[in-house]
């Protein structure tokens, strides 16, 4: 089933009792999620766990065996955010007696995680409001909850910002919403490593989900970047890809990416008004598959809302359509 033998992929050389597992995913990009094991007390804290499925659970156990770690050695599983590639296996691991932790606001999104028709309903309504074509709306309406997401229930532990209780290491939760409303990063004081989930990635910028106009997700994201920037850290261990050895430089790059995108939108709007969907087509002229088109729409709307809240642009209704 798998395209790689165990540990054929490079595992990070992290220090002070931190182990890394590149766990395969059922899609090609990104092809792996980074699972981390942090030594603590008489066992380990696991950060993220991959997608649901017996084969993926077996693969995780093989990796653990290679590290001479048993599932019973895991004292705590922490999910950085509520995406299936990070917490899909959580219920299976909980069945082994491992307590599961998410940020405290996760309880508000459990139903959406378990039923993707609920999760995408707001997006469909929002896309229709901003002149998305019928084919796009039909694609959203056809989405079903995939088996690789698994089902989750209320976590055993609801994390708040600050030092995590009942662990030996000085491990701190940092609330970093933007890519996901529940996203957290973890700071290990002894190594000055930040485990960033999908908040900060080495090669790409995570997409910013947007399905309503009441939340400025891009503002949340940039504020979360600033929060990490101010912490005295040396390395970022991301949810995908290689370690980030120059974290402050990477954060500056990511902020510049969003600045340039907002500038591009403003340049389009200098000479003409556009609907939300027309702006998607301007920013992403190449033909995209269904998934990437959904991401492009949300990313575009996130930037439009951000600019509107900055007072740079505004919406107005003409001929029963919303224009920017």
Q: What is the meaning of each model-derived region?
A:
Residues 17, 38, 48, 81, ...:
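Divalent metal-coordination and catalytic microenvironments
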């Amino acid at each position: 089933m798998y395209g790689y033998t165990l540990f054929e992929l490079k595992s990070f050389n992290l220090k002070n009792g931190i182990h890394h597992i590149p766990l395969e995913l059922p899609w090609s990009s990104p092809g792996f999620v980074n699972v981390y094991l942090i030594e603590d007390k008489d066992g380990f804290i696991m950060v993220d766990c991959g997608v649901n499925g017996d084969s993926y659970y077996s693969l995780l156990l093989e990796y653990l065996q290679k590290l001479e770690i048993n599932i019973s050695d895991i004292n705590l599983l922490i999910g950085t955010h509520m995406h299936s590639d990070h917490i899909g296996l959580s219920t299976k691991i909980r069945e082994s007696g491992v307590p599961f932790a998410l940020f405290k606001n996760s309880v508000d999104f459990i139903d959406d995680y378990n039923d993707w028709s609920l999760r995408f309903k707001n997006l469909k309504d929002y896309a229709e409001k901003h002149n998305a074509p019928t084919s796009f709306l039909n694609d959203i309406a056809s989405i079903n909850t995939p088996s690789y997401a698994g089902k989750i229930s209320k976590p055993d532990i609801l994390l708040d910002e600050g030092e995590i209780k009942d662990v030996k290491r000085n491990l701190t939760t940092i609330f970093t919403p933007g890519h996901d409303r529940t996203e957290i990063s973890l700071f290990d004081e002894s190594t000055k490593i930040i485990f960033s989930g999908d908040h900060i990635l080495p090669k790409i910028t995570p997409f910013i989900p947007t399905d309503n106009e009441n939340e400025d997700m891009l503002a949340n994201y940039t504020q979360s970047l600033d929060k990490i920037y101010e912490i005295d850290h040396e390395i970022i261990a991301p949810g995908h890809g290689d370690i980030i050895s120059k974290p402050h430089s990477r954060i500056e790059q990511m902020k510049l990416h969003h600045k340039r995108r907002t500038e591009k939108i403003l340049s389009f709007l200098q000479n003409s008004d556009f609907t939300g969907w027309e702006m998607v087509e301007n920013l992403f002229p190449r033909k995209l598959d269904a998934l990437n088109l959904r991401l492009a729409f949300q990313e575009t709307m996130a930037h439009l809302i951000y600019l509107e809240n900055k007072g740079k642009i505004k919406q107005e209704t003409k001929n029963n359509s919303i224009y920017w």
